Amino acid sequence: MMEWFYQIPGVDELRSAESFFQFFAVPYQPELLGRCSLPVLATFHRKLRAEVPLQNRLEDNDRAPWLLARRLLAESYQQQFQESGT
């Protein structure tokens, strides 16, 4: 299900929540992420597994998987703070 994600060059080298946010250029507050990195990454993982990127061969964009993963990570981060009221 997540093959598309693991095909993004460099993804297999990410080891921390901060490294994911830096790699995908998603803005975050370090003090907030430090408190909720596990729930954010768990939500991100669920979203990645649920998402099946559509491949439009007419508009082949090499960055499409990276852009999709970036959006899902940002959504996961925002969702954590909406749920916790922070």
Curated annotation (Swiss-Prot):
Q: Does the keyword Translocase apply?
A: no
Recorded protein name is: Nitrogenase-stabilizing/protective protein NifW
Query: What quaternary structure, including any partners, is listed in this protein's UniProt entry?
Result: Homotrimer; associates with NifD.
Domain of life here?
Bacteria
Any single biological process term in GO = nitrogen fixation
Its biological purpose is as follows: May protect the nitrogenase Fe-Mo protein from oxidative damage.
Instruction: Write out the similarity annotation.
Output: Belongs to the NifW family.
Q: Keywords in alphabetical order, please.
A: Nitrogen fixation
The record's section on InterPro entries has: NifW
